[in-house]
């Protein structure tokens, strides 16, 4: 699943199809809400495994999709995160995803949806009311429904950091600090309040069904 937040004028999809000789369905979302763009793509996916990719990001291995598919041959794998790199055009900062406490409140050590994959039958939609907490809200609901994700230790994808990236543009909306013993982070108070209202029981007792 490839998601583009901009209108393509360079026939990129046609060139990809010609180079790799495979068929794909191109669904064009006509609106201007990035979250709805992703949900539209998700709702049209027909394969067994969904691997989101965005126009900002790239695979770092020719065998990335093969490695991801291998993970789903393991018994019980419903969704998975892979190792990733944050790339600024010059250097790679490589990381392995970690599910930290207070992930739902923005302590995101898992990275963007570029690093995640999941079975089609297990998917959730992204919440259109969120922007800064869009990804962690999705991860939270996925874990509540499907349990703890598998972690693929291989570095398979790169998040390309640049000023036009949606997450970079959203930093101007930070207006509060969430405190944590291992380091504080900035967040948007309205989105944080929305999350607290959406999951009141979890905020009181932050425990997942897969935790003993």
Question: Positions of the model-derived regions?
Answer:
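Acidic metal-phosphate-binding loop of nucleotide-sugar-dependent transferases
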Residues: 6-7, 57-59
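Conserved donor NDP-sugar-binding/catalytic core segment of glycosyltransferases
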Residues: 63-93
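Conserved nucleotide-sugar donor-binding catalytic segment
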Residues: 82, 99-185
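Acidic donor-binding segment of Leloir-type glycosyltransferases
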Residues: 1-28
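Short beta-strand-to-loop acidic/aromatic patch adjacent to the donor-nucleotide binding site
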Residues: 47-58
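Glycine-rich, basic loop-to-helix element that forms the pyrophosphate-binding segment
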Residues: 28-45
């Amino acid at each position: 699943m490839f998601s583009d937040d901009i209108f393509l004028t360079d026939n990129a999809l046609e060139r990809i199809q010609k180079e790799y000789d495979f068929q794909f369905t191109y669904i064009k979302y006509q609106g201007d809400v990035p979250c709805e763009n992703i949900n539209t793509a998700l709702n049209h996916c027909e394969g067994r495994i969904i691997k989101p990719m965005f126009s900002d990001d790239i695979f770092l291995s020719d065998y990335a999709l093969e490695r991801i598919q291998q993970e789903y041959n393991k018994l019980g794998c419903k969704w998975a995160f892979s190792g990733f790199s944050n790339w600024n055009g010059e250097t790679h900062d490589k990381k392995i995803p970690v599910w930290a406490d207070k992930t739902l409140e923005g302590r995101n050590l898992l990275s963007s949806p570029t690093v995640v994959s999941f079975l089609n039958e297990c998917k959730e939609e992204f919440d259109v009311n969120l922007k800064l907490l869009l990804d962690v809200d999705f991860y939270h609901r996925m874990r509540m429904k499907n349990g703890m994700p598998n972690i693929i230790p291989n570095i398979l994808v790169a998040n390309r950091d640049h000023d036009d990236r949606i997450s970079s543009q959203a930093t101007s909306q930070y207006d509060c600090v969430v405190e944590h013993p291992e380091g504080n982070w900035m967040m948007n108070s309205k989105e944080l309040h929305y999350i607290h209202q959406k999951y009141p029981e979890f905020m009181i007792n932050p425990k997942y069904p897969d935790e003993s």
